[in-house]
Amino acid sequence: MTSSSRSLRYGIIGVGMMGCEHIRNLIAIDGCAVVAYADTNATSRSNANRLVAEATSYSDYREMLANEQLDVVVIATPNHMHRSIFEDVIECDVHVLIEKPLGINVAECQTMIEIERQHQKPGRVVWVGLEYRFMAPTSRLIDEVDSGVCGDVKMIAIREHRFPFLKKVDNWNRFSKNTGGTLVEKCCHFFDVMTLIAKSQPVSVYASGSQDVNHLDEIYDGARSDILDNAYVVVDFANGVRGMLDLSMFAEGSRNEQEICVVGSKAKIEALMPESIVRIGRRESGRQGVIETMVSQTSDVVQGFHGGASYLEHCAMQEAIKQGLESGVTLEDGLLSVAVGQAAHLSIAEKRIVLIDEILG
């Protein structure tokens, strides 16, 4: 695979909102260059050209793969296109960053894992874009938990109260058939963070949710938008840890968009974003002993849409490539994050607890 002694040459497949986010991050990192990009949408290609005019533009990613000498390919297309594009990319001698969710359902993810196994190359890094674990407050919270401050972790609560889904090219994100559903498309990030903190496998899911406020009057080509906009999801892990997600996508009037709370036998830790606050409260110290710290990325980190997390994700992946390390966010991580989301949607539909083994097959 790639030599660590030269600049990494990147090709981007899909240069909509997230693809351009990747470009902005990569042009700010030394030792790499975006040399080509591909997108079927002319407006998206024009937007990418304004960022990297020197890169070659393609309307067909297959032509880009055939014509360019690439080291890394980033797949940032709509979710339902991930699997088929991955099948083509993995046949090339390149490292791969594939955006979340890995696939729109578990079956797709399992197929992609098997395809990668069949095309394994020494030193190849295949990385899933679950970058929320790199947000500064979240990363600090994880480090504090790992240090043992909490004692034995028992409860993980994540709240995301935010704005509705943004408008995307051809409105692809208005339909669950394209996204996998809100709890896959959006919330795979949080199920990944939960699993990372719990250090255990999710075993069951119970959820309640609906589409109550957003996109109710949106109809495209005769089909009405069907993406839910609020939910509660409870996840039980094999080691006894419990996780809970509280999602509202009509809660713009919130001081923080994301709040993570981990409670253990010795302490409680909270991470608040975008306030960039981490709180640690030890049981022995009570309410008056809660310590609050401002935690933010260093000034050299490109903030972008995710508080610098996407930038740090690329830095971590490049370090893995150059040092011959394994991926920090694996296809298996991507699979589990999708499995919990898919289980949550099934739980809502059938009003019952769903075992992860049912979903994984």
Which residues does each PLM region occupy?
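Beta-strand-loop-alpha-helix segment that lines the small-molecule cofactor/substrate pocket
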Residues: 65-67, 72-79, 83-131, 148
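C-terminal helix-rich "cap/oligomerization" subdomain common to oxidoreductases
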Residues: 1-4, 17, 31, 72-74, ...
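Residues forming the Rossmann-fold NAD(P)(H) cofactor-binding site
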Residues: 20, 83, 188
